[in-house]
Amino acid sequence: MLKVIEHHSASAGNTFIDCPQMWIIEKIYGFETEENARMRMGHAAEEAAHHALVNQITDEKLIISDAKGKYIERCGKNGGTIDDEYEWTAQIANTFVKELKQYGKLIHYQREYNGPFKDLCLPVVAKTDFEFNDYIVDTKATAKVWRYAPTAAERHKGRKGRINHNYHPKPDHLRQQFLYRELFNKECLLLYASAWDHHTSDLGDHVGHLETLIQAFKSIEHILGIAKTKEDVVRMFPLTFDNWRWRYSPGAEAFARKIWHTAWK
């Protein structure tokens, strides 16, 4: 097998499923996507929520201050207080704290797994978000929680519209959490939060998501098994830029063009 990766992960498997070309430049050629405002928002809100839970902080103003500070720390010279995400981060962190408290005492944060998985040659690595006695909760900061417009009856009762399940839970999130349920032997939940709304999804009766992810891992191993060079892998896929991942990865398109040009010279 071509020795270019050491393990599988849900994030890498999802990238391969969505956009194998992006997987190639990231995992085989080492391209790293710069953290954008949405990514900073998610990381900062999660970190602030963890700090609040561990230290039993419930004062919303303190959580807001901490979340904004963590967002700025991640900005460096790029963006900052002018970003919409700067304000959103603070509200999302508060929502995370309020929702996560209902699950009881936090027993693990970012617990890791690194080990074998049935029928795979390479090990699988995983890292949880918030783990409680009964659940693992993966937090997802988002600009919008997607709902249908409320019906007249819902408006009359002061209720929001129903969740649009085309967006929540997302297939890649389900694939990850089904894998985590298998690895950590515990039920998993997805907590989506925007600055104005939130929604918690369980894995429900969705089927096939774990199998799809494992098949992606097997496909990766098959490709690396028949390829003799990195360029062989590149030549297996045409270079296209129609996947959404390219829009959020500055520099990735130019990097990929050079890789494909070199492989086909």
Model-derived features: positions:
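Metal-dependent nuclease catalytic regions and adjoining charged, substrate-binding loops involved
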Residues: 169, 179-265
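Short, surface-exposed beta-strand-loop junctions and turns on beta-sheet-rich folds
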Residues: 31, 143-145, 196-197
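Short, hydrophobic, well-ordered secondary-structure elements
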Residues: 46, 134, 177-182
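Short aromatic-enriched loop/helix-cap "lid" or pocket-rim segments at secondary-structure transitions
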Residues: 99, 149-150, 201-203
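Active-site-proximal flexible loops/turns
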Residues: 26, 53, 145-148, 183
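Non-catalytic protein-protein interaction segments used by genome-maintenance enzymes to assemble
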Residues: 113-176
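A structural signal for short, well-ordered beta-strand segments and their strand-loop junctions
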Residues: 108, 131, 135-139, 188-192
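Metal-dependent nuclease catalytic cores that hydrolyze phosphodiester bonds in DNA/RNA
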Residues: 1-127, 265
